[in-house]
Amino acid sequence: QCTDIIQQNSELLLKLINDVIDLSSLEFGKMQFSIAEHDAVATCRNVTDTVGKVKQTQAELLFETSLEELYIETDDSRLQQVLINLLINATKFTPDGSITLKLEKQSEKMALFSVTDTGCGIPKEKQASIFQRFEKLDENAQGSGLGLSICQLIIEHIGGKIWIDPDYTGGSRFVFTHPIHQTRNNSKKED
């Protein structure tokens, strides 16, 4: 049992260190982005399958889209990082019910992703600060409070926006846009 606790704490510490490194790299423009064309539908299916295997909740994990495929210019590993973070966060606050990842084509230029859960939701007074560093909805929940800050920086770097849907009251809904084609400004690669 002691070994399990040490292992778990080691993993949490490593995650915290990696989050701090990611945050610093993003803030100073040092994080490498490898932009290429990827099928966002396939990425969403893969992420949903992955999180479904490790989730520690009875909530049903779903992926919804009307699209057969949607090729976007992105850094697929960073897109997966954002999606996994949002889905894992949802599992922490949704003991049962459902968590739904949805992908839509908002326009010819923009994809729209959302993660909706039927959990406890985020109080209105916390919504404005939820993307700040070290902000946590539940101080007792595992995590560093850096994940949403990192998600925001990644999404902004690739030319999108991320927000909480303030009108959804059945839990919480995080929404973000992602350009289908990268422009010169948001696809530049850092050295």
Indicate where each model-derived feature is located.
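Conserved catalytic submotifs in the C-terminal HATPase_c
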Residues: 34-39, 60-70, 106
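Short alpha-helical Gxxx[C/S/T] motif in the catalytic ATP-binding
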Residues: 147, 151
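Short helix-loop "hinge" at the ATP-lid/N-box region of the Bergerat-fold HATPase_c
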Residues: 90-91
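Short conserved segment of the HATPase_c
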Residues: 122-134
